[in-house]
């Protein structure tokens, strides 16, 4: 039996028109969120100190070269990889040109010193690219080129294919570059990619790439970033369109319910145990529009052979979005699913024998289209931004349970260190 949601709604901002599953993007740091609507409007949502209080503020940004009759499809943003500086925003839209709609990708980036992170300045510095396909998801990924890192846009389309856009430093603009040179694992997809997820394996020069397609095809690849060699690749075929895929570390819980192996969630509180960070065991969440959502455990060791179901995930119409959170503040990761049936579902991993269990649900006034985690208030804990059909809801941790959890972890840490000192004092000298 699912319990109540431990998060409280801190704010709700109405959108000027409806959004979609690709319409929410987190700005780096505490910069807030960008929410795009179908009728060509982009809102900047953030928390601001007003009259000695922290208040949510939403204002429209005036991005240039977006026609009044344009329909925004997707939005994405990233901060340039060091040593380069600056914020990059990408917006795809379709312009109604009468007989035939015209798709475009606008990339915004200001090269004027002192304006690289000013959103209003960035919104006026546009590169307009006409597309030969209908755009879908716009995301970004970091690539290693020699001894340098660079961040690129990846745009899926209905051609079907995935297109790569990288900055040409000499020309001070972005341009499309061949996909196979940097992402050979994303070639020759059988249908349009609805969702793509790329993550770098910590303390390595390798990455994992997952893609889910409209035909139900799912592919996961393990790639050497230096040589671009595909070290391992797995694929499966499901019955319906894949709405989202998500790669994430999944560790075995210990007897206290906390995560073993030293891996800490983004919202974990309290000190961590000393020692090197272990390499996480990556698992893959696959959400389908007509089937139950599943997690393939430890893909690097087991491929796509060990499947764990998320019970009840198919009871609320299609699953549209997913993200990781740490609502229990136990160092583990919960999986959040947003559904067209207006429910937000939270699942926790209870070990190999019990698998995933439904922790809590929360209902919203409309379909849950997009989820995004970000520290919007600057308190060190990540809020959960929930994008619904015509509104943006922000959920945050309750203060009292969070403070209590912090005290518990501090007590355990003090006891652990006292036990270590006692053991050292009674050791036998050599």
UniProtKB/Swiss-Prot annotation:
One Gene Ontology term of the biological-process aspect is: negative regulation of TORC1 signaling
Major location (coarse): membrane
DNA-binding is among the record's keywords? no
| Region named Disordered | 256-277
Q: Does the keyword Membrane apply?
A: yes
**GO CC field:** actin cytoskeleton; KICSTOR complex; lamellipodium; lysosomal membrane; stereocilium
Read off the InterPro entries from this record: Kptn
Query: Disulphide bridges in this chain?
Result: none
Keywords of the record: Actin-binding, Cell projection, Lysosome, Membrane
GO molecular function, one example? Answer: actin filament binding
As for subcellular location, the record says: Lysosome membrane; Cell projection, Lamellipodium; Cell projection, Stereocilium
Record text on subunit structure and interactions: May be part of the KICSTOR complex.
Its annotated function is as follows:
As part of the KICSTOR complex may function in the amino acid-sensing branch of the TORC1 signaling pathway.
Q: Indicate what this protein is called per its UniProt record.
A: KICSTOR complex protein kaptin
The record's gene field reads: KPTN
